[in-house]
Amino acid sequence: MARTVVVGLGRSGIGAARLLQAEGHQVTVLERSIEPHLQSLAADLRLQGIAVELGKPLELNSFIPLLDQLDAVVISPGIAWDHPTLTALRQRGIDIDGEMAVAWRSLSHLPWIAITGTNGKTTVTHLLNHVLESNGLRAPMGGNVGHAAAEVALKWRQPNAQRPDWLVMELSSYQIEAAPEIAPRMGIWTNLTPDHLERHGTLDAYRTIKRGLLERSEIRIFNGDDPDLRSQRSSWDKGLWVSSEGPGTANHRADFWIDAEGLVREPQGALFAASALAMPGQHNLQNLLLVTAAARQTGLPAKAIEASLRSFPGVPHRLEQLGHIQQMSVYNDSKATNYDAACVGLKAVPPPAVVLAGGQTKQGDASGWLKQLDQNACAVILFGAGASELQELIKTSGFSGELHCCSNLNAAVTLAIPLGVERQAACLLLSPACASFDQYQDFEARGEHFRSLISSHLTA
């Protein structure tokens, strides 16, 4: 019997293996590591009838014993689509899929709302899920946030499972690239700035991947405030455009916008006050409009959307306000994993700020972030693997505030608190501008560590 190999015992790999096994496939999971927590996960999967082999790197030799019966290989988003081993397997006639493609084949009969973009997509995903479910619609979310898409599909297969009205799926460029068949009912594109260039090579290649998802979407929703998306507007024959900067010009009219009085509008009239969403920053006004546009396409009335916006609790690790230390507001923006996201977050908080930044650096244009640091930060404390590189970058920019380097986040927080009090900073902001993988499993783990370090110091 043909066998499918799933590579990796991460969230998406486990989801794909379980879904494929439930659909009747013979499944083997290959995992390069042998760490104790993975041995426990492997034992659980074996009890479900799924074969697992640990200590198997992504090399052709790991697949040789299975080649005679191998039908397909499913990879996680963290594996490059053009990895040499995958190329060698394709040359042998073996299909390569991403976990998202496996989920799509199981869920394609349901209407998807797919959210992509460099930044903002997680907030939009959470907010849209909240708006839809607050109004009685079944709209589970997953993909790049929350549950793996395959786990969402598994839940739908359970006896007596209620059919979802919508599936709210966040898709990264990695997931889109490995699932080119996904064709959502609705696609939302939040923005595009240089990111993941170490994976995709060029901004054009990165843009093309995300554009493909929107081209396959029946309803397309775009952030017209984003310079890159706006520059591409004439290339789209249809779509809904939103703008937090007004109705636009005759040639670039917005379909949803915020007027001079702070009201959210559509061509038929005013809907509600933009202040219904209590999240700081211009970027969150854009997120509000994207969600409003999508919610209106599902048929929700303005009053229902407004009430849901007012009850939204926010998203962990995205400008999450943790409390105060004396006069300082404390924000956890661990999700700011690139320069553009960090710049947006810094614009949204009250100055002057003590900024904690660092981790695994990425390619990208740091000029906007450096300018914002000089305008809004009285001190920057760097930590992690990229601290020295960032220190040189910030020094070269002529930053006028205090600049310190620490080995890790513990030391950075220990230094930041008294420094912020002394400098009478308005806020203490974790905004790394870097990936987390030098010292953490993911940005969530980094944010949770920051929360634990800061909790005993909070005064309100």
From Swiss-Prot:
UniProt GO molecular function: ATP binding; tetrahydrofolylpolyglutamate synthase activity; UDP-N-acetylmuramoylalanine-D-glutamate ligase activity
Reactions catalysed, as given in the entry: UDP-N-acetyl-alpha-D-muramoyl-L-alanine + D-glutamate + ATP = UDP-N-acetyl-alpha-D-muramoyl-L-alanyl-D-glutamate + ADP + phosphate + H(+)
One Gene Ontology biological process: cell division
Keyword entries, A-Z: ATP-binding, Cell cycle, Cell division, Cell shape, Cell wall biogenesis/degradation, Cytoplasm, Ligase, Nucleotide-binding, Peptidoglycan synthesis
Pathway the protein takes part in: Cell wall biogenesis; peptidoglycan biosynthesis
Signal peptide from the UniProt entry: none
InterPro entries in the cross-refs: Folylpolyglutamate_synth_CS, Mur-like_cat_sf, Mur_ligase_C_dom_sf, Mur_ligase_cen, MurD
Annotated binding of ATP, by residue: G117, T118, N119, G120, K121, T122, T123
Enzyme kind, highest EC tier: ligase
E.C. no: 6.3.2.9
Predominant cellular place of this UniProt entry's protein: cytoplasm
Compartment annotation: Cytoplasm
Keyword GTP-binding: no
Membership in a protein family: Belongs to the MurCDEF family.
Function in brief: Cell wall formation. Catalyzes the addition of glutamate to the nucleotide precursor UDP-N-acetylmuramoyl-L-alanine (UMA).
Name listed for the protein in its UniProt record: UDP-N-acetylmuramoylalanine--D-glutamate ligase
Gene expressing this chain: murD
